[in-house]
Design a protein with these regions (language model features):
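Chalcogenol-based redox active-site neighborhoods
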Residues: 1-171, 178-182
Length: 184
């Protein structure tokens, strides 16, 4: 399982639209999910140890961000034939068990992941209320294990975006498992 780093933030880049199916069966779009102060788009999956290491804290931070006007959405774009744990029924199970405060969408064609330029799980895209990219960085210093101390990089960046509409100038790239792309 290779560790992948995404590129740095391209400030002002517009959030691509999408319309994907949530674990509850509803189709949801970017515009439906946009919060009053912004939107956090998170590419995650169920099998990746980098995601597993942060998931309970990510859920808690997304709850807190929601109270600040930042909505969150998780998108699973991996090919589930590579890792069956990433299949839709497992997505439903984990979303229920952890009481996700955000939609968990499936991207079976992987077109949304490609339009965002997602390269790993987790991969975070923080947009302000105008849909302009302001953060593309890490959750915190956790890797495959939970860090003993959390700097809460993602939370602090998104809180700043809620307050000012602008992300931090200094951002540390996320690290995670490579996307599991469909065979051509």
């Amino acid at each position: 399982m290779a560790s992948i780093h995404p590129p740095v933030c391209d400030f002002g880049w517009p959030a691509p639209d999408f319309n994907l199916v949530n674990v509850d069966g509803r189709s949801l779009s970017r515009d439906q999910l946009m919060g009053e102060k912004g939107l956090l788009v998170m590419f995650i999956c169920n099998h990746c140890p980098y995601v597993k290491a942060i998931l309970p804290r990510l859920v808690a931070d997304c709850r807190e961000l929601n109270s600040l006007g930042i909505n969150s959405v998780a998108i699973m774009s991996n090919d589930p034939t590579v890792y069956p744990e990433d299949g839709f029924e497992h997505m439903q199970k984990i979303a229920t068990e952890l009481h996700f405060p955000f939609a968990y969408l499936v991207d079976p064609s992987q077109q949304v992941a490609k339009s965002y330029g997602a390269v790993c799980t987790p991969d975070f895209f923080g947009f302000n209320s105008q849909g302009q990219l302001q953060y593309r960085g890490r959750f915190d210093e956790s890797r495959k294990e939970t860090a003993s101390h959390s700097s809460r990089d993602l939370f602090h960046a998104m809180r700043g975006i809620a307050e000012t509409g602008v992300g931090p100038a200094e951002q540390i790239a996320s690290i995670g498992c490579s996307m599991k792309w469909l065979e051509d």
